[in-house]
Amino acid sequence: YTLSDTLSLHDALPIFRMTRRQLRLGAFIMATGHHIAAWRHPGSQIDSGINIDHYVDVARTAERGLFDQVFVADSPGVWHKGDEESFSRQGRLSHFEPVTLWAALSQATRHIGFVATASTTYEDPYLLARKFASLDHLSKGRAAWNVVTTSADTVHGNFGLGAHPDPALRYERAHEFVDVVKGLWDSFDDDAFVRDPASGVYLDPAKVHTLNHVGKHFRVKGPLNIERPPQGHPVIVQAGSSDDGKELAAATAEAIFTAWTSQAEAQAFYRDVKGRMGKYGRRPDELLVLPGISPVIGRTEAEAQGKWAELQALIHPSVGLATLVPFWPNDDLRRWNLDAPPPYYPEPPKGVNSRAHVVIDLARREGYTVRQLYEYLAGARGHWVVVGTPQTIADQMQDWFENGAADGFNVMPPVLPQSLNEFVDLVIPELQRRGLFRTAYEGRTLRDNLGLARPASRYAAAPAARAA
């Protein structure tokens, strides 16, 4: 194959990329780890939420393992529902704002992408567009935005609102929000900045575009005050399995984070969300489905089970009960018998995300006691927990990947940094041995490594509008 003189190696990467489909892997990190008792474990960094050296080490470990990206969840409020005792025993109360954190870590890494959560309910489109464009420039094309509408009904008080908006309104706003942000990222054509000292011309004003958006929720003039991001647009990620969430992903997202413990349910979700994309003029391969997996790794099955038992033994009952409060918000769970089933199964409260339906249905179907239910949620809040050897874990991942349940996974280490080190040292080589995962990064940007196309500007085929 002969490249034309104008086609760069960067542009040609999709031509030369291996044709065999391979896993996409993200490292989904939470301070001390995903298990609710992780901060008490000797393998954790106890002050990790505000320890930049810890995050540098974690990002470099993930990059050593050739992960596509690292991701931290975020909320514009404190993560807690429960009584004062559980509040005092909860290890996730203090943590960095993610875009700030990733801006710092982009200077300590070279290849790995950075996914930051930001809410379309409690952020502003112009400021968010500027923030993520800046991160994409700082990281040289490794930024991604995890679009959330914020399901927590405890946040509105931080923003002067009398109530948390209902889900339908939040998702309606989200669709418009994402469209505005993408339009702002296209404010400048890729070649708008001439920067020619000889002529004295810095910018071609014919290649600057004012958005002039007027919609139901936003009025945004533009242009943005930073040039087009290296990736065109930072990668758009979405997390949500409700019907509204699937529609938002089908319309706007390039990756979706989801939570399933059953392969059959994961397969149904995979077919459903990809099947919705055609009406938005999109192909199924333009969206990567990445379920969460929390691996507890041992060199033997007995060692892995022992590690899991050790973590479960660290759960204080008050912290365990606090994980159930979102599903039973109108009851005093301290009165419940921990070793009996919940006294009743409610309809999930308004505004609680789709995972609430999964959890309540599971508790009813399996006949879990209260203790068994919070122990089930303790590992990864309802995500898939796999306990076993590197070979067992690779078997499970391969099975889901090759049978239409996933395009890859969000790996959720139960304890940090210990569990991520184990995954990189033990599971990654097994996946590589099977040809399921890369042995080197393919490109320079997060889009390159995820196999996603760089989006054209919405103005590429239209006459340029002069900036006002």
Put a short name on every predicted segment:
Residues 19-20, 63-64, 103-110, 136-142, ...:
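Acidic (Asp/Glu)-rich catalytic clusters
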Residues 26, 44-53, 102-114, 119-231:
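Hydrophobic, small-residue-rich alpha-helical packing segments that form membrane-like cores
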Residues 1-13:
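Short, small-residue-biased leader/transition segments that mark boundaries at the very start
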Residues 38-53, 117-126, 162-164, 230-243, ...:
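Active-site mouth loops of central-metabolism enzymes
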Residues 23-27, 70-72, 112-118, 141-147, ...:
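Hydrophobic faces of well-ordered beta-strands that scaffold small-molecule active sites
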Residues 25, 62, 66, 105, ...:
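Conserved, mostly hydrophobic/aromatic
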Residues 15-108, 231-234, 362, 461-468:
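N-terminal beta1-alpha1-beta2 module of alpha/beta enzyme domains
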Residues 15-34, 167-231, 264-271, 275-401, ...:
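An alpha-helical appendage that flanks or caps ligand/catalytic pockets
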